[in-house]
Amino acid sequence: MIKQPALAQEQYACVYAWLALLFFREVDDEGLIQLQSAEIADWLALLKRQPALAASVALLEQKIAALSLRQDAQLELAADFCGLFLMTDKKSALPYASQYPQQEPGMIKHLLLEAGMEVNDDFKEPADHLAIYLELLSHLHFSLGESFQQRRMNKLRQKTLSSLLEWLPEFTNNCLKHDSYGFYAALSQLLLAIVLFDDGKEDLSIVAAE
């Protein structure tokens, strides 16, 4: 069997940015069209070439395909998002590191400081939101293309992945338990698979895009 090459730095950066957006805000009408577009289908096909990601991608593809059969899909996805990520009852999956006892308090602020980044004043959520971790990983993968800071950025990438993996599995389990339709449950499973893959829990080497 021919082994598929690992994801390129730029591909990681783009997929992290995409996932950050989906976990940060509700899917609007334009976002729903994009989810069902050929562009996203091509992206998922690219990810699916990696054996470690294939099952998670296939599940998400099924959930995206099912959106066309779901009446008022955009409104129902918005309701799913609100119920999972904005509520505080026991049937939610809050996307904040501080909600999980495994996470060291304030870790994301230290990571952002090391990266020379800060949270935009327009960002109204707490700084430990999942989307901030994913935006940081996106930035770090783009920065890995610059050879003069590759070693430092790669070390920071590993620290960010390790920090995220302290609580991401529990977040994913909460999505699985409480997302009755399953779109965000599938999305969280894909995210966890990608983070594990990036962290080297699967056979992975960072390569530059040709």
Swiss-Prot record:
A Gene Ontology biological process term = protein folding
UniProt entry tagged with the keyword Chaperone: yes
Keyword annotations from UniProtKB, A to Z? Chaperone, Cytoplasm
Gene3D superfamilies recorded for this chain? 1.20.120.1820, HscB, C-terminal domain
Any one of the GO CC terms: cytoplasm
Q: Does the keyword Cytoplasm apply?
A: yes
Q: Where in the cell is it found?
A: Cytoplasm
The organism's superkingdom is given as Bacteria
Family assignment? Belongs to the TorD/DmsD family. TorD subfamily.
**Function statement:** Involved in the biogenesis of TorA. Acts on TorA before the insertion of the molybdenum cofactor and, as a result, probably favors a conformation of the apoenzyme that is competent for acquiring the cofactor.
Q: Which NCBIfam families match?
A: PRK04976.1
* Name of the protein this chain belongs to: Chaperone protein TorD
Its lineage opens with: Bacteria, Pseudomonadati, Pseudomonadota, Gammaproteobacteria, Enterobacterales
